[in-house]
Amino acid sequence: MPTQRLFTGGDHRFLQALRRELGAAVETRLAVAFVLQSGVDLLAPTLRAALLRPGQHVRILTTDYLGVTEPEALEALLALPAVNGAKLELRAYEARGHSFHPKAYLFRHASGARRAFVGSSNLSATALQHGVEWNWSSLEPADGEVLLDAEMTDLL
């Protein structure tokens, strides 16, 4: 995959890129406003395989903002088995009337390289497969300037 790329839906499917990164990463951080069962179903096999790898760490931050996130989707994520020191953390931002609407997918590889996708896709089948969504991908090499830390690390 190129160092930078825009995924716009149509022939540029975001789901395949997410599966590829999740399948290779040692650490995954997602911040998505809405988590739907349809999106969890699409990523569950890849997440399940990732959580079988020793030391894998998956963090997902979502919200109760607007009541869109589906409780059954969160339950399905928490039900995924993790072994060999792997773990899945799930956090929910309590909106309390404030907007919480990020869509960021961050991956760190064993080499130290990091890939970030930032855009408009929530964790839903429509957003990941065929919706009109824009998601920008950027690869930061292991020896590159660390751009993905600071606020993202604090948030996720």
Language-model-detected regions and their locations in the chain:
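PLD/PLD-like phosphodiesterase catalytic module centered on the HKD motif
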Residues: 1-156
